[in-house]
Amino acid sequence: MILKIADNIYSPMGFTTAENYAAVKQGRSMLESYPAGTMDLPEAFTASLFHWDEVEMTDGCTPFESIVIQSVGRALAQTTVDVSSDRVLFILSTTKGNVHLLDSRSPRFPEERVLLGEAAATVTRHFGFSRTPLVVSNACISGLSAQITAMRLLESGACDIAVVCGADIQSRFIISGFGSFKALSPMECRPFDIERLGLNLGEAAATIIYTRSETQGEKGQWQAVSGAVRNDAFHISGPSPKGEGSYRAIRAAMGDTAPDELAFINVHGTSTMYNDEMESAAIDRAGLLDIPVNSLKGYYGHTMGAAGVLETILSMAAVDDGTILGTRGYEELGVSHKVKLSAQNAPTTKQAFLKLLSGFGGCNAAMGFRRRS
């Protein structure tokens, strides 16, 4: 049994899970409009970005490494985990890491720090982990891929504790890249809405700590029940219109869970025309149209490598609170399959949920979680 024993969300919304959940439940969003010229970009954009004067920077570390250290440290502080043990593994989920260093004229950091493995090693040295860290970088599904990897390693006995952190920060390189795809919305995103124009990007670090069994007197209320990654190889940047990969991941991740056990499905919900339509098709094919669906992108934007971890943690907090969080920005259904969305929070007594992500290259992931009584 794979159990969660601690977590943290470190974002522009707040530096603890409790702060983040309370703000989202109140309907707050950290999305802001930034004028042309920000990060030397030629066009205005909307995103959720850190105010870096509020972030505690770690000596000798980049901004990206610093937010990872802040989140991991806050999660570890909730436990008695001995990170120096060779049974404890650190897994970093990120899509771009320190890629901003490629655009930097500062000689402060050596060139190799742009490598994802070097960033992860910097974090493990800070805390004193003895094991070599593992990096999972699998486009937008990185956060679920990392958790599924942790599950499999724990189940195989390769480690006893897995500390999984998902994180990304934004840069001119990233924002201009999404802009070149015409995927960015100039205003706040509207997942699944008929007026949606595209996605917003965001920054965050989120950490979840799993154990193979209850150890050191710590109790885990949440179980990671199942997980699956499926790649339909439809297109390098566009999803399968039929949601083939997502459907197959859902089917595999559902396992023995009955649909009526689910409180909700927390979808990727990026607010792009193709993603939201594809996810609605996959949910329909899986026979889950009666299950409430929500997206959290209207609160944080797309936090990339952090998304799968951050949104899993918030979904756990919502079930703990007996709540289905509303989809900020949603008003009128704008996909062809009648998924069950609402902009408003709703009550629930159910104790399980399904988390979905999809990404470039045709990759798709799904995980099932259940709260233990």
Enumerate the predicted regions with their spans:
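Conserved small-residue
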Residues: 6, 24, 90, 123, ...
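Extreme N-terminal starter segment of soluble prokaryotic enzymes
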Residues: 1-6, 351-352, 364, 371-372
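Conserved active-site "lid/cap" helical segment
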Residues: 13, 18-94, 98-99, 249-260, ...
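Short, high-confidence coil segments that cap the C-terminus of an alpha-helix
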Residues: 85, 158-160, 262, 350
